[in-house]
């Protein structure tokens, strides 16, 4: 009997959000309200039983929906776990998709990894108004804020889906778009193992630390990775041959010799560009830049990796760079964001290692699920549910050699510019902080050119991803990865007597200054005890609160 074809389910798009107690260290926030918007109806609920009421109401809807929550896979969905059953998709501890009855829940952050505030349509609010003892008197304002978030998210997601389809992640979306211009095939596991030693990430390095007063400039490359994809050639197959000399077909080199800050080696704490001698694995792009700048002095070439099939990704980059430029000129902020994400999200997908992929399932507690008890399986038990994970049976290897070449090309651009920098203080992937930068193309819009992003007269550098640049009394640029030193809630900093956009701008500057003061303290030899008010929810229901002592590195 011929197999019947499955009827495709037509899903309606919806946006959803919980409002909870404000974040406070060691206090697990509880939802007190939810909002739901599908483009036609908006529904909200207020009360301590809002979780149960949401599921009860959702089960009355007969039309299947895909329901998006921004960062839902790390927050909102965790309040609903006991209602989920069946297969779910999890990547790096984030729930990407899970089902409840006829509906699917998806984390919109997976396709739009930007804060909602990037849309410039998000309403700001003082989260202190959401404390239990005060929220009733601010109910109307809170519900307006909640509705605004739902409507904005629905708009963003709907526009994204209209352009790219109902994709699960931005990386998958970007690769799907790239394949329309540059078709590629998966590669073999053995090829991945052979090429992976040549893959490294971006360069981040503090050349000086402390509090530095000088004429300071911040330069960055316009779209570094799209530039590397378009304007450098890259291997584009899994067919290669080894030799011991460099030719026009060489893309990777294993060599022994002297390295003067040109190329990295891996350490337990990350990439190190300061190993002066030894054996190195280097892309041809960095090799050429190192030879030209005198920062690579080889004693011998151990082997070269050579490819006959190569490409640039010019058609893909030109298409979306042009679309992004048109969106900018039209004042279309949403599509400007979309195209920027597409341009910057494909190269990393080539480097993904699928060996740690897992298939996940969620069941009620107290049962045994066959097939999830072998090697590499994982079981996370909770009172109300059990999460079961096992190694994925079907997966593809993308071409890590492509990613190794693209990231190597990006580092080569940075290396050449560092050689032209006057008093380089700091660099990170596509940017250099220095006194001046000469003999490089300067243009605010040209792909691959350098742009003067900021200027200042004082900088506090405490380590990698930890600096604050000042112009006078104002912090104009700040980095504090791993510890949110800049207040996320800027509502309480907004002057009440100002027009909202102007008040928001003032609050953002105040928030930067607050973060900058903390980095000044650390860069001056002190320490800062960071207490994260935001909880870290685990899939098994556990909640962690992070404390860190931040000091110079």
UniProtKB/Swiss-Prot annotation:
Pfam families noted in UniProt: DNA_pol_B_2
The enzyme's E.C. designation: 2.7.7.7, 3.1.11.-
Signal peptide: none
Xref: SUPFAM superfamilies: DNA/RNA polymerases, Ribonuclease H-like
UniProt GO molecular function: DNA binding; DNA-directed DNA polymerase activity; exonuclease activity; nucleotide binding
Domain notes: The N-terminus contains the 3'-5' exonuclease activity and the C-terminus contains the polymerase activity.
Name recorded for this polypeptide: DNA-directed DNA polymerase
